[in-house]
Every structure is written in structure tokens, then in C-alpha cells.
């Protein structure tokens, strides 16, 4: 059901496209988006699914969190809200039909933040996500794909980096929402851990060094 015509085939003569430069994203403030988050039963935060990608041998394969991500999507209810922090697949994957079958599992309102691997045309993503942005602000939180440094008020929830300890000094008010097992955070979980001084390191919570 979730197979792709590209799986198991070598990518011959493939020239990797340059990633989009989103390290300094345009930060969106959207009242409708913020109201949907305010009124949701549960707000989930996830990113870096990398559902398919090309290995070192040039073969397209499913990512290691492929099936756990689908299981998480099926738990969502219509009155939930999903914040996706970018990188649906690795950027060499171009099978839109296979990706459509995954995205059709989403049954709640959503926002997608474009990651460096999200290089398909924007109109494709807009078919499956209610909002598609480079970054956005909700209350005192900025959501982005790349971590944003130099926050003095509020904080930044981001993807891209799968561990946090390397970036304690660089991003002291940032929280990455990656989980190795593919499960989704709730926004309440993230706020609770951040306020207690913990960072997320591959899904394990470590007390931030002072």
C-alpha cells in the first residue's frame, strides 16, 4: 500500500539539487493559524520524517521511522492540530503519488514548515497542509525548521537537528522536536520540559547545563 515505484532501484546519473536556503526564514504571523492552535483539542509537534531517501548505494528505501510515523498519523483526531517542522522525505525522492498516499492519512488541521529537503513545488504541499510557511510565530514561540539563535524572549521550537547538547551555547532558548522512534510530541509536553530546563537529545530528556 505504501510502496513507491522508486524503491529498490538505483538512482543512475542523479545530480543532487541544491537545498533551499531557509536558515534565515520569513517568519509568518497568521491570526487564523493561531486561533486553530488555540482551539485544538491537542496540538502535536513533529518533523524530520524522512519517509524515503537514497542510501549510500544509490538505492531508494523507506526511512527507519516510516511505519511508526504512519501509526502516529492515524492517532490524530479531527479536532487536533499538527505542526510539522519540515523534511517529509530526503530531497532526491520525487514520487508524489507515493507521498500522497501517506499525506492522505492526515485528518486534522495542519501547518507545514518547509525544510531543506522539501524541494517539491509548494502547490503540492498546499494540497495536504492548511498552511505552508518558512516559519511562524504563536504567542512567544517561533516554530522553524532550522534552529534560530539569539532569542532573548520566548523561545524557538525547531527540527533539522536531531540532538541538542552540541547547541546549548549557540541556541540557549531553543527546543528540537525530533524523536528517534517517530512518535510525536504534544506542545504541552515541550512547554513542560522546556520550563523545567530540559533539552531533547534524540528523544531522551537531559537537564540543560547552566
Where are these regions (language model features)?
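Conserved beta-sheet core of the metallophosphoesterase superfamily
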Residues: 118, 122-209
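A general structural motif
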Residues: 40, 78-80, 107-109, 152-153
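Hydrophobic "anchor" residues on beta-strands that sit immediately upstream
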Residues: 44, 83, 111, 155-156
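Short, flexible hinge/linker loops that cap or flank conserved catalytic cores
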Residues: 36-38, 104, 149-150
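Metal-dependent catalytic neighborhoods of phosphoester/phosphodiester hydrolases
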Residues: 56-57, 86-104, 114, 119-132, ...
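Conserved beta-strand termini and adjacent loop/short-helix elements that scaffold enzyme active sites
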Residues: 46, 85, 113-115, 144-146, ...
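N-terminal active-site segment of His-dependent metallophosphoesterases
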Residues: 1-97, 192, 196, 205-210
Amino acid at each position: 500500500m505504501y510502496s513507491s515505484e522508486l524503491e529498490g532501484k538505483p538512482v543512475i546519473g542523479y545530480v543532487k539539487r541544491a537545498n533551499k536556503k531557509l536558515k534565515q526564514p520569513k517568519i509568518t504571523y497568521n491570526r487564523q493559524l493561531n486561533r486553530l492552535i488555540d482551539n485544538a483539542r491537542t496540538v502535536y509537534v513533529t518533523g524530520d520524517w524522512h519517509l524515503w531517501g537514497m542510501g549510500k548505494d544509490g538505492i531508494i528505501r523507506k526511512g527507519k521511522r516510516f511505519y511508526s510515523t504512519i501509526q502516529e498519523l492515524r492517532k490524530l483526531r479531527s479536532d487536533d492540530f499538527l505542526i510539522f517542522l519540515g523534511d517529509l522525505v530526503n530531497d532526491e525522492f520525487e514520487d508524489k503519488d507515493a507521498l500522497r498516499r501517506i499525506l492522505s492519512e492526515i485528518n486534522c488541521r495542519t501547518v507545514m514548515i518547509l525544510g531543506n529537503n522539501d524541494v517539491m513545488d509548494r502547490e503540492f504541499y498546499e494540497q495536504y497542509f492548511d498552511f505552508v510557511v518558512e516559519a511562524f510565530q504563536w504567542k512567544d514561540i517561533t516554530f522553524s525548521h532550522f534552529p534560530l539563535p539569539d532569542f532573548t524572549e520566548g523561545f524557538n521550537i525547531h527540527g533539522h537537528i536531531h540532538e541538542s547538547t552540541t547547541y546549548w551555547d549557540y541556541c540557549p532558548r531553543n527546543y528540537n522536536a525530533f524523536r528517534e522512534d517517530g512518535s510525536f510530541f504534544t506542545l504541552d509536553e515541550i512547554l513542560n520540559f522546556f520550563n523545567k530546563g530540559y533539552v531533547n537529545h534524540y528523544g531522551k530528556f537531559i537537564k540543560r547545563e547552566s
